[in-house]
Structure formats: structure tokens, C-alpha cells
Amino acid sequence: MTGTTWHLLRTESTSPAENMAIDEAIANWVAKGELKPTLRFYSWAPHAISVGRFQRATRDLDRDALEANNIPVVRRLTGGRAVLHADELTYSVILPESTPALPTNIIESYRLLTEGVRRGYRELGVPAEFSVPLTEEDREALRKPKSAVCFDAASYYELAVDGKKIAGSAQVRHQGAVLQHGSIPLSVDDEVLFDCFAMDETEKQEAKTRFSEKAVALNDTLKRFVSFDEVAAAFETGFKDAFSLTFEPLVFTKEQQAEIDLLVKKYESDEWVWKR
């Protein structure tokens, strides 16, 4: 997978449903050999909550609070727990499952692809390292999460700084393609975040405490403001260096855009979002 040319795509301020539709569409085309492997950077407008494919959104989320805060919900193709996509850069990396040197084991392929993210952080001066749950307490927290929030615990080979999770990613094998996407928070408003979940006040305060102990945003780590453009440039360099890549821009054809538009309807539908 090294020394090759990939597509590079930036789609800023895109709707939640379209963001997920684009990732799935690219995965479909990459699997069929119609597109090269693709690295994508994107942001969300409006801000939104995404839930994992198998997450029980009807149980975990407070729909009244979401409506009051004008925060839509979208269900991802990948698994995992809920993420508030607000002031962040989201990345996705999509390549054929048959790619040489790509491990068939999901955890090991996750570690390999996340190396591009780790090097991106290094470009920004952030000493991010892979997290491996070492204690039984850490492993139990992964088996039995204490909340529906993604960032309150680091899984295998997620990235952390001083023990705090700095990025949350998920991976899926889809029709012959590997899709990994993840959230890179620039800043976090934990008041808005925890208002979105079905918790009483005691549970909410406990979750906020865990979150402050287990997660950190990029601005807080660097103690300065970082922009989407700065982070995207650093992560592009990180992937280039990790895999000796060159990039060419991706522009969708009319036919491809029509396929994306069809998938948008799926991701907007209550049948998909609230199916569990």
C-alpha cells in the first residue's frame, strides 16, 4: 500500500447525511475498482451527533434535548458509540480490503491506518501515541462502557496524549472495502455534549468527570487555536509520510453525485437513524 497514488478530497461544512453518504459511496466505488484509495477530510454543518451502526439511539439519546438544541442525528456505517461533531476535523480513509500489506485482522489494520493520524498529530507538535488497555479495569471499561459517549474511554490503538484520548475512530469492512473514519476535536463543549444523552443529573456529572479525565481536544493540548486548514494540512503530510503516498484531487462526476444523493436519503431517514 506504500508508494502509490491516492485520491484526496476535502468537503467542508457538509450536512450529516451527506457526510455519511459520501463515505459509503466512496467505499462502494473503491471496492469495485472505480476509484483509487481515498483520504478525505470534512466538517459538519450543522453540528450533529453520529451514533454507531448498532448503537441503541432510542435508549441512549434525549430526543427532546436534541431538538431543543437543533442537533440532528445520523447513524454511521461503522460501529462504536456516539460522537458530537462540532468544532472538529473528521477524516476518512478508504481502500480495498485486498490491499497488499493491509492486515486482515481489524485491530491490526486499525493500528496501521491510524499511523497516518499519529504522524499528523506529530506534524502539529502533539506527541500522540497508541493506547493499549493494560489493566483489567481498562479492559472492563471497554467491555461494559459506562456511557454512550465515544470519548470517555480509549480502545485498542486509539491515540492518546498523557493518557487522554485525543481522537476517536471506527472501522468497517464493507463490500470489499475498508472504511475507517474518525473525529479529531479541535475544541469540545461538554455542556452541549452531555445534554444530548438520556441521563439524570447524577449520571451526567459523573460522565463529565470521566470525560475530563479521559479525553482532551487539540486546542487544549497545544494551548492555542488551530484551524481546520492547519490540521488538514498536517494530516495530509502525516499520511504521505506514513505510507509514501502522492495525492490527486477527487472530483465527483454527475453520475457519482447522483449515487451520493440517493444515499443521502437513506441517512436522512428515520428508518435508518432510529432503527434501534
Curated annotation (Swiss-Prot):
<dbReference type="InterPro" id="IPR045864">
    <property type="entry name" value="aa-tRNA-synth_II/BPL/LPL"/>
</dbReference>
<feature type="active site" description="Acyl-thioester intermediate">
    <location>
        <position position="150"/>
    </location>
</feature>
<comment type="similarity">
    <text>Belongs to the octanoyltransferase LipM family.</text>
</comment>
<comment type="pathway">
    <text>Protein modification; protein lipoylation via endogenous pathway; protein N(6)-(lipoyl)lysine from octanoyl-[acyl-carrier-protein].</text>
</comment>
<dbReference type="Pfam" id="PF21948">
    <property type="entry name" value="LplA-B_cat"/>
</dbReference>
<dbReference type="InterPro" id="IPR004143">
    <property type="entry name" value="BPL_LPL_catalytic"/>
</dbReference>
<feature type="site" description="Lowers pKa of active site Cys">
    <location>
        <position position="165"/>
    </location>
</feature>
<dbReference type="GO" id="GO:0033819">
    <property type="term" value="F:lipoyl(octanoyl) transferase activity"/>
</dbReference>
<keyword id="KW-0808">Transferase</keyword>
<comment type="subunit">
    <text>Monomer.</text>
</comment>
<dbReference type="InterPro" id="IPR050664">
    <property type="entry name" value="Octanoyltrans_LipM/LipL"/>
</dbReference>
<keyword id="KW-0012">Acyltransferase</keyword>
<dbReference type="GO" id="GO:0036211">
    <property type="term" value="P:protein modification process"/>
</dbReference>
<feature type="domain" description="BPL/LPL catalytic">
    <location>
        <begin position="33"/>
        <end position="247"/>
    </location>
</feature>
<dbReference type="InterPro" id="IPR024898">
    <property type="entry name" value="LipM"/>
</dbReference>
<dbReference type="GO" id="GO:0009107">
    <property type="term" value="P:lipoate biosynthetic process"/>
</dbReference>
<protein>
    <recommendedName>
        <fullName>Octanoyltransferase LipM</fullName>
        <ecNumber>2.3.1.181</ecNumber>
    </recommendedName>
</protein>
<comment type="function">
    <text>Catalyzes the transfer of endogenously produced octanoic acid from octanoyl-acyl-carrier-protein onto the lipoyl domain of GcvH, an intermediate carrier during protein lipoylation.</text>
</comment>
